[in-house]
Amino acid sequence: MVTWKMINLGQVSRNQFWGEPDDVVRRPGICNGVVLFDTEQVILVDPPYSNEEMLRCLDAHAGLKPKDIDVVYITHAHSDHFDGIHYFPAARWCTGMEERDILGEMLDARKLDGNKLEGLREKLTPNIQVVPLPGHTMGSTGLLFDGPEGKVLVAGDSVMTREFFEHQKGYFKSESQ
């Protein structure tokens, strides 16, 4: 069984269903960061912050330091989902196979080693399944596992807000990717 903890709450940069135009940033876009505890591995999903806030959230909400993270998993190639990856150079870096090339190029552009990134199709660990969730980006993925409360899906930005789900509308960036 896999247990998990949220380390921060994200926010969308704009929401057309609240009357906010897609071409005006209202607030910084930040994803939810999640830590999974799977037998011998600690997995950080979508490290959201490029600054020391990443370290503070990890410690305050999960009691962890960068050296404690075995795997960093990125759900899709939007920068708010990998801004903090540089804090985890010793960890294994993974994403879904469909995002691997573009995300690798984005890491290279930040002077990080994009070749280190592994593209996965089915399993991250024997207990954690990689699930394709195309929509927000065509290569978006989530992680599905059995938790204490039943089945859990860490889904990145698959559903931005209830309004996006109800209207079956993608985020403004999605249409070009």
Give the predicted meaning of each segment.
Residues 1-40:
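Zn-dependent metallo-beta-lactamase
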Residues 1-4, 37-42, 121-131, 147-151:
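Beta-strand-turn-beta hairpins that frame and shape the catalytic cleft
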Residues 33-35, 123, 140-144:
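Short acidic loop-to-beta-strand element that houses the catalytic metal-binding Asp/Glu
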Residues 44-48, 70-80, 94-96, 132-135, ...:
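Active-site neighborhood of phospho(di)ester-bond hydrolases with catalytic His/Asp-centered motifs
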Residues 52, 77-83, 101-102, 138-140, ...:
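Active-site environment of divalent metal-dependent phosphoester hydrolases
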Residues 52-95:
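Active-site metal-binding motif and surrounding structural segment of the metallo-beta-lactamase
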Residues 64, 68, 87, 91-177, ...:
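Metallo-beta-lactamase
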